[in-house]
Amino acid sequence: MDRTAAQNARESLDLAFSISNFLQTGLDRHTLSILIALCEHGVNPEALAAVVKELRREAAALHQHQDQS
């Protein structure tokens, strides 16, 4: 990747991360970059959103179970 392309990619990720924070998605920069890359490779964004939601539900249930133990 040349310098200009790398700079454009960085700026695009910065913008996406700013929007993500504004929308209070709770996604960190690294996770967001992975999700964007998956979308760029043809993964359905709605399916990814469903997976993220399910993983968050599972993590919350696990934490709740651990707190009760």
Curated annotation (Swiss-Prot):
InterPro entries xref list: MZT1
Signal peptide boundaries: none
Localization of this protein: Cytoplasm, Cytoskeleton, Microtubule organizing center; Cytoplasm, Cytoskeleton, Spindle
Primary subcellular site in the record, as a coarse category: cytoplasm
BP-aspect Gene Ontology terms: gamma-tubulin complex localization; microtubule nucleation by interphase microtubule organizing center; mitotic spindle assembly
Protein name: Mitotic-spindle organizing protein 1
Role noted for this protein: Required for gamma-tubulin complex recruitment to the microtubule organizing centers (MTOCs).
Organism: Picea sitchensis
Record field: transmembrane: none
Cellular component, GO, one term: gamma-tubulin ring complex
